[in-house]
A protein has these predicted regions:
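Cysteine-centered motifs
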Residues: 5-6, 13
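Short, Lys/Arg-enriched N-terminal segments with co-localized hydrophobic residues
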Residues: 11-24
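Conserved metal-binding segment of the jelly-roll/cupin
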Residues: 128-151
Length: 207
């Protein structure tokens, strides 16, 4: 590969060429979870005294990891400590999600809602933060939610389909059957809508 500085000068030119010369698979580390199709993505971070640079999305790299979805929507939420959102999913226009935190920390949770899955009703909880810069890939067929661990958290995520409120469903976050350890610190802050979520035994699901 021919490396050029283009409009980059000095140290920035060196860093750009370093990025271009890095094998694509080395730009993003794939970490397994208890689900074969849910995984953590850890980007390579280029940092110095000025700060850092990373690629949060690269279509080619993601395709090499098996993620070929076309993302159609980006969402950004700001929440304060102990806010709990979820567990949300859409029974039609089901969404795959790529979740990351740009500031603060959350406990991110995915619940398998596919009745044909041996893991139906099971969950995965992952710590995502602005510090660890990890992302969580959640395919369609899962309910998703998170609890804020830090004082404030900014969560951004890509979706593979548009928000469709008429098909949105909420799984009750506190359903004992789910056995989710939210690592609570007192009573969480939950919207009235999420408090009205249904238990797994009564929830609409996927095949």
């Amino acid at each position: 590969m021919e490396l050029t500085c283009c409009n980059y000068y000095g140290k920035e030119c060196f860093e750009r060429n370093l990025l271009l010369s890095t094998p694509t698979m080395d730009l993003l580390k794939k970490i397994s979870t208890s689900f074969p199709d849910v995984f953590i993505l850890e980007p390579r971070v280029f940092g110095d005294e000025r700060g850092f640079f990373l690629e949060s999305y690269n279509r080619k790299v993601f395709a090499e990891l098996g993620i070929t979805h076309q993302f159609v929507q980006d969402n950004h939420s700001r929440s304060t400590r102990n806010v709990l959102r979820g567990l949300h999913y859409q029974v039609q226009h089901a969404q795959a999600k790529l979740v990351r935190v740009i500031e603060g920390e959350i406990l991110d949770v995915a619940v398998d809602m596919r009745r044909s899955s041996a893991m139906f009703g099971k969950s995965e909880a992952v710590a995502l933060s602005g510090e660890n810069k990890r992302m969580l890939w959640i395919p369609a067929g899962f309910a998703h939610g998170f609890r804020v661990v830090s004082a404030v958290a900014h969560v951004v995520y890509k979706t593979s389909d548009y928000y469709a409120p008429e098909y949105e469903r909420t799984l009750l976050w506190s359903d004992p059957q789910l056995k989710i350890d939210w690592q609570l610190e007192g009573e969480p802050i939950v919207s009235a809508k999420d408090q009205r979520g249904v238990k797994l035994r009564d929830a609409e699901s996927f095949e």
